[in-house]
């Protein structure tokens, strides 16, 4: 029986999180720190608060568990003569879980994007950015400004010039 190596992550507000190495390896940034043997006193993450780090860890744990589950299912299917399509249902379960996970307030969503980018977690970055893209899709510039609380700093003349230059986007 092998022991699971633990990695300590330190949030910007001083909280420590001890997680399995497999979960930590979901982050390319942390993976490189582990490879460079920079984990002795924990890995400081100055750009990630404990609130956001706990959400990131939750996401990574779930995705590691899902990957392990689908590997086990694939191994079991390969061992039997009849193959089943059980991995399809776990993919659907994960998509459902992701869609529930990402139902957060705007501030948290943007902090998750920043953390996913900093930690280089492609799946989480894709999920969060797609969520923002879906929030924008089909909206006018005014609606987008209202959604994201963006102040319009264009003069009417500048706005008209942008509309002319990007006519294709307004059709």
From Swiss-Prot:
It is found in: Nucleus. InterPro entries: SKP1 (IPR016897), SKP1-like (IPR001232), SKP1-like_dim_sf (IPR036296), SKP1/BTB/POZ_sf (IPR011333), Skp1_comp_dimer (IPR016072), Skp1_comp_POZ (IPR016073). SUPFAM superfamilies: POZ domain (SSF54695), Skp1 dimerisation domain-like (SSF81382). This is SKP1-like protein 1B. The lineage of its organism: Eukaryota, Viridiplantae, Streptophyta, Embryophyta, Tracheophyta. Part of a SCF E3 ubiquitin ligase complex composed of SKP1, CUL1, RBX1 (RBX1A or RBX1B) and F-box proteins. Interacts with SKIP1, SKIP2, SKIP3, SKIP4, SKIP6, FIB1/SKIP7, PP2A13/SKIP9, SKIP11, PP2B11/SKIP12, PP2A14/SKIP13, SKIP14, SKIP15/FBX3, SKIP16, SKIP17, FBW2/SKIP18, SKIP19/FBL20, SKIP20, PP2B1/SKIP21, SKIP22, SKIP24, SKIP27, SKIP31, SKIP32, SKIP34, ADO1/ZTL, ADO2/LKP2, ADO3/FKF1, AFR, COI1, EBF1, EBF2, EID1, ORE9, PP2A13, PP2B10, TIR1, UFO, SKP2A, CPR1/CPR30, NUP58, At1g55000, At1g67340, At1g78100, At3g04660, At3g61590, At4g38940 and At5g49610. It comes from the Eukaryota. Pathway: Protein modification; protein ubiquitination. Keywords: Auxin signaling pathway, Chromosome partition, Developmental protein, Ethylene signaling pathway, Host-virus interaction, Nucleus, Ubl conjugation pathway. GO terms for cellular component: cytosol; nucleus; plastid; SCF ubiquitin ligase complex. Signal peptide: none annotated. PANTHER family: SKP1. CDD domains: BTB_POZ_SKP1 (cd18322). Gene3D superfamilies: Potassium Channel Kv1.1, Chain A. Its main location: nucleus. Expressed in tips, cortical layer and epidermis of roots. Detected in whole seedling, vascular tissues, pith and vascular bundle of young stem, leaves, inflorescence meristem, young floral buds and organ primordia, flowers, developing seeds and through the valve of siliques. Expressed in male meiocytes, pollen, embryo and endosperm. GO terms for biological process: auxin-activated signaling pathway; chromosome segregation; embryo development ending in seed dormancy; ethylene-activated signaling pathway; jasmonic acid mediated signaling pathway; protein ubiquitination; response to auxin; response to jasmonic acid. It comes from Arabidopsis thaliana (Mouse-ear cress). Pfam families: Skp1 (PF01466), Skp1_POZ (PF03931). Involved in ubiquitination and subsequent proteasomal degradation of target proteins. Together with CUL1, RBX1 and a F-box protein, it forms a SCF E3 ubiquitin ligase complex. The functional specificity of this complex depends on the type of F-box protein. In the SCF complex, it serves as an adapter that links the F-box protein to CUL1. SCF(UFO) is required for vegetative and floral organ development as well as for male gametogenesis. SCF(TIR1) is involved in auxin signaling pathway. SCF(COI1) regulates responses to jasmonates. Belongs to the SKP1 family. Residues 113-171 are annotated as: Interaction with the F-box domain of F-box proteins.
């Amino acid at each position: 029986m092998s022991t699971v190596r633990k990695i300590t992550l330190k949030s910007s507000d001083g909280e420590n999180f001890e997680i399995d190495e497999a979960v930590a390896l979901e982050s390319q940034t942390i993976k490189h720190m582990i490879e460079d043997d920079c984990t002795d006193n924990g890995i400081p993450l100055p750009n990630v608060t404990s609130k956001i780090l706990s959400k990131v860890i939750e996401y990574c744990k779930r995705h590691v568990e899902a990957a392990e589950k689908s590997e086990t299912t694939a191994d079991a299917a390969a061992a039997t003569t009849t193959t089943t399509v059980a991995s399809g249902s776990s993919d659907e379960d994960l998509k459902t879980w992701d869609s529930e996970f990402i139902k957060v307030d705007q501030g948290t969503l943007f902090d998750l994007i920043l953390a996913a980018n900093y930690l280089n977690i492609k799946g989480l970055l894709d999920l969060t950015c797609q969520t923002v893209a879906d929030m924008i899709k089909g909206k006018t510039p005014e609606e987008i400004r209202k959604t994201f609380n963006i102040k319009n700093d264009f003069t009417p003349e500048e706005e008209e010039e942008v509309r002319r230059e990007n006519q294709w986007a307004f059709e």
